[in-house]
Amino acid sequence: MEQDFQLVSVDAVNAKHVGTVFRSVYGNDFPIQYVYQPEAVAAEIAAERLTAVLAFDAAGQPAGYVSMFKNAPNFQLWEVGNMVVNPVYKQSRLSLLLANCCQNAELMNIAGSDGLYSEAVCHHYMTQVGSAKAGMADYALEIDQLAGSSFKEHCADTERISCVFNFIEYTKPSLPTYIPNVYEDMARTLLQPLKKRDILASTAVLPQQGNLRQEEKYYEFAGTWKLAVWETGATWSEDVAALLAEAARRNVVSLQVAVNMALPHLGAAVEELRKQGFFFGGVLPRWFGSDGLLMQVVLGGEPNFAGAKLYTQTARTLRQYCQADWELRKT
């Protein structure tokens, strides 16, 4: 007989059960240690940086967990986080129930957000399939983003792992989306599944005044450095060169720059990135509230495009496009 489960939002009262679920799979070795600390889990939820659901079995024992968290420059975006199922229930429908929680705005406490995204790993198909079933579309391909050695489950057979950026949109953006001429056709294709927005050609030149305004996330253990550029400023060429020099000093492998697509001079900013070796990654919808254009470079070796296992035709088309753009940069 099929096991019944009760799904409840995580709060300060039941947060003590989160660690129990993680221990059933990882022992005490899950790298994000706050999951074992009820007070820390409750604090993240209170600060609206985390939202999560627990599943309890018929006996009232914690059986599963799914979470979302905020990791984008736009605080109105949620990223699909961890899903953990006690091995006792691996053959049950619990994984599906937890995955479906991501579409339940009330249970997950995400009502009013701009959208939901995930970065689906490409050394197997499972996460990509789950994202597609949840109604997400593919918008970007982050080449060689993660270190393969960091995966104990579903061990990777490549040194680096790429990720597909999936997204589903809940609100309409208020700002226009500028697209560079060099990527116009692909950008328009990627934007099609989203809500209607004003799409304009980017023809403005780089500004002669103003300062670079950006946010960054540096993951030393993964060799990954991500930057979100709100404004390019007056010294964009020099800033890009300095970024590449610093990335080399840090032994970064995956360097990603998302540029605000609300900038009228986006095309000129992208052209400078291309001149210095960056190639196309895709679109990051609502990354700034407005959309973002992802440019990337793989340092220390050639990108492993062929190593990515891609589920959808969109992702496979995107790989061909990214690789062709990289080939142009190489020459």
Regions found by a protein language model. Give the residues of each.
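Conserved GNAT acetyl-CoA-binding A-motif
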Residues: E106-V121, R250-N260
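A conserved beta-strand-loop-helix scaffold within acyl/acetyltransferase catalytic domains
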Residues: F5, S9-Y89, A120-V121, E215-T224, ...
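Conserved active-site alpha-helix within GNAT-family acetyltransferase domains
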Residues: C122-A140, S150, P264-F280
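Non-catalytic interaction/regulatory modules that flank or connect domains
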Residues: R188-G282, R286
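C-terminal "cap" of GNAT-fold acetyltransferases
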Residues: L146-P180, G289-T317
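Conserved catalytic-core motifs of GNAT/GCN5-like acyltransferases
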Residues: Y117-E119, G135-C155, F279-S290
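A short, well-structured alpha-helix characteristic of acyl/acetyltransferase catalytic modules
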Residues: M1-D4, D11-G27, S174-L206, N211, ...
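Glycine-rich acyl-CoA binding loop
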Residues: V80, Q91-C102, M108-N109
